[in-house]
Amino acid sequence: MPIGVPRVPFRSPGEEDASWVDIYNRLYRERLLFLGQEVDSEISNQLISLMVYLSIEEENKDLYLFINSPGGWVIPGIAIYDTMQFVQPDVQTVCMGLAASMGSFLLAGGEITKRLAFPHARVMIHQPASSFYEAQTGEFILEAEELLKMRETITRVYVQRTGKPLWVISEDMERDVFMSAAEAQAHGIVDLVAVE
């Protein structure tokens, strides 16, 4: 039986009585953002709008992006990444559970020195994929070219964010590479592993 999104009491400054708001709304007010699903256009737009709004509201207070995501679409993910780099506040990233594919890309996109993984978290990187089997031959070639450009972009970002050489990242992206939190730290995707 679904219970829906939990609601918690929240009292706005100057109000006597607390009102009940969904837990995510309450946490957003504390600058805590969550990516707990596959990246798509809808969640991308929601996270981008929250980051922009919160950065306008208070530009010197860090944002926290908690990630437990199997990955998702490339373009919406890159849009989130670009916004993280654009907004004035630092965006601290926290991996809890799994940060795979686009999730690991966003994890690496946090402010360097402020990227954290929980001790039992898993991180996975690989190359972007597409649904070639649905395309006609001409579309297939155009899509393959675009996919190659996306792979180059993602590879360059990983190189910049991790400090690893291009050949290491390129080789890792050839297949699914799963890492523990400590391995992700050694790989430069996160800076710290939380202590149990």
Curated annotation (Swiss-Prot):
Cellular location(s): Plastid, Chloroplast stroma
Family to which this protein belongs: Belongs to the peptidase S14 family.
SUPFAM superfamilies: ClpP/crotonase
One Pfam family, short name: CLP_protease
Top EC class of this enzyme: hydrolase
Chief location of this protein within or outside the cell: plastid
Superkingdom as given in the UniProt entry: Eukaryota
Gene3D superfamilies (UniProt xref): 2-enoyl-CoA Hydratase, Chain A, domain 1 (3.90.226.10)
A GO cellular-component term linked to this record: endopeptidase Clp complex
Function: Cleaves peptides in various proteins in a process that requires ATP hydrolysis. Has a chymotrypsin-like activity. Plays a major role in the degradation of misfolded proteins.
Keywords: Chloroplast, Hydrolase, Plastid, Protease, Serine protease
BP GO annotations: protein quality control for misfolded or incompletely synthesized proteins
EC code: 3.4.21.92
Catalytic activity: Hydrolysis of proteins to small peptides in the presence of ATP and magnesium. alpha-casein is the usual test substrate. In the absence of ATP, only oligopeptides shorter than five residues are hydrolyzed (such as succinyl-Leu-Tyr-|-NHMec, and Leu-Tyr-Leu-|-Tyr-Trp, in which cleavage of the -Tyr-|-Leu- and -Tyr-|-Trp bonds also occurs)
Protein name: ATP-dependent Clp protease proteolytic subunit
